[in-house]
Amino acid sequence: MTLSTGTLGSIASTHTLPSYLDANHLGPWGNYLQQVDRVTPYLGSLARWVETLKRPKRILVVDVPIEMDNGTIAHFEGYRVQHNLSRGPGKGGVRFHQDVTLSEVMALSAWMSIKNAAVNVPYGGAKGGIRVDPKKLSMGELERLTRRYTSEIGIIIGPS
């Protein structure tokens, strides 16, 4: 994000949008933004909410270190995205995959917001991800990874 110098008012009027709002962004998040742009003309009075749909409420990237069965310490990258919490707490699982990206987790959290709203359940949208091949971990390692990831994202999950 680029900001100019000066008063708060001039900063607010001259900043560049965060890169995650760029519909030309490659990957799942960019695809989601393009889909939102494509349906906007059909939203009528609801179109005023489009910018909200394009902005995740919170993005958390965490380092998740765990002790492996052989005694070494391995580090995994984890993500938690809370897309929208206006309908209630964020609902969404965790994707364990070696190729998961922040872009993918952002898109999945946004779709959770839309799915929950479409079926009128009192939840917002959220999603998590951990870059790991779970097939390469023992059950004990997978349990330690899950517990540590949950601990690391604890600052944004749970009762308010």
Give each language-model segment a name.
Residues 2-160:
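N-terminal ligand-binding/catalytic initiation module
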